[in-house]
Each structure stands twice: as structure tokens, then as C-alpha cells.
Amino acid sequence: QKKSLLVTPMKYGVISGGKKIRSTIIFDTGRLFNIKYKKLLSICAAVECIHSYSLIHDDLPCMDNDSIRRGKPATHKKFGEATAVLAGSSLLTLAFEIISRENNYLTLKQKNEIISLLANFSGHTGIAGGQELDLKFENKNKNINQIIDMQRKKTGKLFNFCLHAVGIVANKNKKEKKLLESLGEDIGLLFQLADDFLDRKGSKKLVG
């Protein structure tokens, strides 16, 4: 992988700033269940890859057409549109490879459940589906339920995953994992509200 020309734009998309709030939530939730941080590292890395992929694609001219991300030039502005598409797609697939690796302190059953969950929440029923709704709603009147549904998918689903995945590692039962997932969704919606407020009131250079 180090020989790939895509490594540099991939690193740029992941490491270049950002609050890393999703990883923080994973670690903090894990602490509540006395889970050693090393058991959560691969999940955090995967989440940051998924989140960064979604931002890279979200900024593309065919999507939201944003030139600034995290106070710096968006990936497509720095490396070109085609490279940004490939870097984002590579981060998406890298996330699943990270979870499937040996010696990441997860059992095979946990890996399978986490991979299935992440695929569900990052694809057409999650992040990608939410982005499609966002594009379809552009310049159209939409009611509050449509907006919430879009935000649940586009932003909330990855927060759902963060808490649910910790529940998997903690060997919680189905009901407990669903409760964690529901809490994650609420956190995601609150985060999106705060983010939207910053987009309107904050400095574009600082907020990105």
C-alpha cells in the first residue's frame, strides 16, 4: 500500500485536521465498559476512514462543490477531482480491511458483526443514502421529517455505529446494543445541529 500514489491524498483526507469526535466517543464509551483501548483502535481507525471518505466525496464538484475542508483546501482542490474520488473510495475499502486484520484484539464473531454493521451504515441505507437525499432536496422545500431522515442517514448512522460497535466488543445483548445505537443517533443529530450552526455563523477558514 505504501507504494500506491493514492496514499498521500488518503492521508491528507484523514489526518488533515478535524475533531476526531467519533473516535473520542468510541474510546469514552469503551471506558464506561472497562474495555481496554487497544481493543477499540481498529474500530476508531475504520470510523475515521469512513468519515474521511464521506467528506472527500461530499466536497466534490458533483456533490456539494466545497473548496475548503477543515480550514484547508479540499482533497479534490489539492490533488484533482479524479484522484479525490479514488482516494475516497480507497479509504472506504480500507476501513473494512482494518477491521478484518489479525491481531487487532477482536474475535472473529465480533469482526463479522462489526463489518456487517459498518457496511449497512455507510452504504445506501446510511451515509451514501443520506447524501443522495441531500442532493435531491437541494433547492426544494422540505419538511422537518425529511430533514431529520436525511441527517439520521448522512450523519447519525456513523454515530450509531460508534456506540453499537462498542456494545459488540463489550458483548452486550441485542437490546443493550440497540439502546446504545439509539443514543448514538441522538448524539449524531445534536452534532449535526451544532455543525450546521457553525457553518452559518462560524468562520469558513476555521470551520471548513
Predicted feature locations:
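Mg2+-dependent prenyl diphosphate-binding active-site environment of isoprenoid biosynthetic enzymes
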Residues: K2-G208
